Amino acid sequence: MQSPCNRRLGGAAVAVAIVALSALQAGAAPPPVPEVTAKDRAAIIGSIVGDLNDTYVFADVAEKMANLLRKELAAGTYDGVTTLPAFCELLTVELQGVSHDRHLIVRWEPPPPDVGGKPPSAAEERARELAELRRGNYCFERIEHLPGNVGYLKLDCLADAGVGGATAVAAMNFLAGSDALIFDLRDNGGGEPSMIQLINSYLFEAPTHLNSFYIRKGDQTEQFWTQAHVEGSRLTDVPVFVLTSGYTFSGGEEFAYNLKSTKRGTIVGETTGGGAHPVRRFPVAGYPVTVNVPFGLAINPITGTNWEGTGVAPDVPTTATAALDTAYVKALETVEAKTKDEVVKREVAWMREGATARLQPFAVAESSLRGYAGTYGLRTVTSEGGALNYQRRGRGKFALVPMARDLFVIPELDYFRVAFERDAGGQVVRLVGLYANGRSEPSDRTAR
C-alpha cells in the first residue's frame, strides 16, 4: 500500500484546477459540456459504488451511500439530469448528504484544450501538476520580515515535500532569526502531509509524534513524527501564531491542530472547515470523471480524535480579516515581554502600539479632525471626506489613523508618528514628528 504521505489531505484537485484555469486565461475555448444517458449514469454510479465499498474509511457509511445511489437510480430520480457536470454535482450532494464528509467529491474533469480532447496520460498529468506547482512557488505565497523581528509566512496549500521541500527549507531558514513566527493559513485548503511534517519539524527540539492516519483498507495505522534532522536551525523556543479562517481546510487544519494540541502554537482567527480524512482520487473508467474517496482518518496522539466535522477552534477568536493584525500585536507583546534589552524593548513597544492603533483605531469626531487641518512649516495636514491626511512638501500624502488624543500613526510608516500640541486655550498650535529612535521634529502652525 502506498503511504498516506503520498496522498493528499485535501486539495486533491488543486493542480488540475490550476491547469484548467491557465488554459482558459491563455484564451483557449472552454471544453464542450458532455451529455449523459441512462447507460452512462448507471456505469458511473457502478464505478463509484465499487470505490466506496472498497475504500471509504467507514464501511457502514459506504454501504448506506451505495444503497442510496442504487435506489435513486432505479427510481429514475436522476433521469432529468442530462449533462455530466450537473450529474457529478448532484452525486456529490447525495454522497455528502449521507456522509457529511466534505472531502467526498465527484468531479467532472475535462481534458485541457491543448491535448486535442484526449485524456492526458498519467505522465502528462503529473508533468502539468509539477509545472503548475513550480509556477505557484509550491504554495509559498508570501514571506516577510515584519518590524519587531516577527517572521511571516503565507502558505496557501501544501505541496509534496518531495517537490516543494527545497522551497520550504529556504523559507524556514529565512525565518530562522525571528523572535516570533506567524503562519498564515487563512487561504490554505489542504495538500500533502509530508509538507506539514517538514515545516513542523523546525518547531520542535525532541522527536514529536504529530499525527496518525488510520487506513481502513488493511486495517493499518501510520504515524507521522517530526524529522530527526532539518537543514538549518530549528526555531524551538520562538512563539508561533497560526492564522485560520472558515476556508482553512484539511491539511491546513492539521497544521493548526498539531500546533494547538502540542501547545506549540496559538491559533488566531476563525474556526476552520472541518475535514480530517485523507483522500485518494479514483478515475471512472471511460469518462472524464474522478471521485475523491476518503480512505482513512486522522488520529491526534494527544486528543485521541481529530477535527472532522468540527474544525479547529481558534485560541483567539477574531475575523479572518483581522487575524493578521491581531496575531501581530500578540507576537509583539510576547517579544516585548521576553527581551532584556531596553533599546529593543522600546522599539518593540513602539511597533506594538502602532499595530494596536491600526487594529483598534481611536475614535475622533469629524469635527475634531478638522481642528488639526493646517500648515505646519513644511508639513500640511488636510481634512478630506472625514479623514485626516499628512503630507510633507515634495513627498507623498498619507492617511493619519488616530492612536490617542492628539496622536496619530501612519500605517505605511511604522517608524514615524504625528503628535499635536495645544496652547492654554486648547487650540492646536504645533505638529511634532515622532520617530521610533526617540528623535522628534516640532513644527509650529503657520496657517489654518
Predicted regions and their residues:
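Bacterial N-terminal signal peptides that target proteins for export
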Residues: Q2-V14
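Bacterial N-terminal signal peptides
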Residues: A12-A23
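Mature N-terminal segment immediately following signal peptide/propeptide cleavage
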Residues: K39-K64
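Extended, small/polar residue-biased N-terminal targeting/export presequences
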Residues: A59-G148, R346
